[in-house]
Amino acid sequence: MALSKRELFQKRRLRNRNKMRKMANGRARLSVHRSNKNISVQLIDDLNGVTLASASSLEPSLGVVGKNNVEASAKIGEAIAERAKKAGVEECYFDRGGFLFHGRVKALADAAREGGLKF
């Protein structure tokens, strides 16, 4: 029997999470959540269980409220890179969850890399 869309998402999410646990080495995790309306990203220190920085399309200061496109995701990627530098994080690993690395997720990652984050 074929897997549903949700089951495939969970399968990808768990596969990615297990791979990242093996190669974490104390680095922060850049976690992305994408919905139909918004996109948000957090820089998480898993050793201490704290969020070091975050950015979301719901923040009025970024000027992308109500926009759900690749350009908005790129602005959020730039914002998280800037906030990560302020938090003293240069290197992290990218946790896309179960989301495919395409479109808005890819735009966010590329903008974060251009902003100076290494992953």
UniProtKB/Swiss-Prot annotation:
Matching CDD domains: Ribosomal_L18_L5e (cd00432)
Gene Ontology annotations of biological process type: translation
Keyword Disulfide bond: no
Keywords: Ribonucleoprotein, Ribosomal protein, RNA-binding, rRNA-binding
Molecular function GO terms recorded: 5S rRNA binding; structural constituent of ribosome
UniProt KW Ion transport keyword: no
A cellular component term, taken from the record's GO annotations: cytosolic large ribosomal subunit
PANTHER family for the chain: 39S RIBOSOMAL PROTEIN L18, MITOCHONDRIAL, LARGE RIBOSOMAL SUBUNIT PROTEIN UL18M
Its job: This is one of the proteins that bind and probably mediate the attachment of the 5S RNA into the large ribosomal subunit, where it forms part of the central protuberance.
Family: Belongs to the universal ribosomal protein uL18 family.
Assembly notes: Part of the 50S ribosomal subunit; part of the 5S rRNA/L5/L18/L25 subcomplex. Contacts the 5S and 23S rRNAs.
Protein name (record): Large ribosomal subunit protein uL18
Name of the encoding gene: rplR
